[in-house]
Amino acid sequence: MQTNFRGRDFIGDLDFTKEEVETVLDVAWDLKRKRALGEPHALLRDKVLAMLFFFTSTRTRGSFEAGMAQLGGHAAFIDSETTQISHGDTAKEIGEIFGRYFDGIAIRQCDWQYGNQYINEVAKASRAPILNMQCDVYHPFQCLADIMTVIEKKGRDLKKKKVVVSWAYAASYSKPISVPQSLILQMTRFGCDVVLAHPPEFK
């Protein structure tokens, strides 16, 4: 078990080793069990997570807010359009300011060829850990949830298990590239045979 997570960012799928990902999944299953049994698990009591969204979200926002509440903390939803970012607040300033206000900063910034750069710039300036709720390159938390589901359905030994990813969500290939890319990066570490199905125009 790998337990050196305190204060670390999770921006790219490969930021954590395979062993660390397995530890995260073990903790997730334990928390899922405790919630199902009604056992107390307020591990984040009095902690506040900033959730900065540049793009809309259904599942990611809902799951992060629910997760923080279930762990005894609070998730502060922040729409970028309601901030001073459009008036000049830089990524560095956001990192410095939010890093002082909050215990963690989660960001969704999917602008093509900029989102990941922005999140990393915030991380460099922040004293609080940064979580990637999706950028133009990675969608690490959705990928972890997908791996949990596959293991629950197919067992822990995923070697040579075939995982087929359909990549046809949007008219532009750039918008959803983070989802299949994260799945390919992470699931192959577990030995999966990942197949990417896509229209011929998506090259």
List the predicted regions and their residue ranges.
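A generic local structural motif
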Residues: 35-39, 91-93, 181
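Glycine-rich phosphate/diphosphate-binding loop of Rossmann-like nucleotide-binding domains
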Residues: 54-66, 151-203
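Generic structural signal for well-ordered alpha-helical scaffold segments
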Residues: 29-33, 147-152, 184
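Thr-Gly-centered strand-to-loop micro-motif
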Residues: 12, 133, 198
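Phosphate/diphosphate ligand-binding glycine-rich loop within oxidoreductases
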Residues: 42-152
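Positively charged, low-complexity intrinsically disordered leader regions
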Residues: 1-66, 138
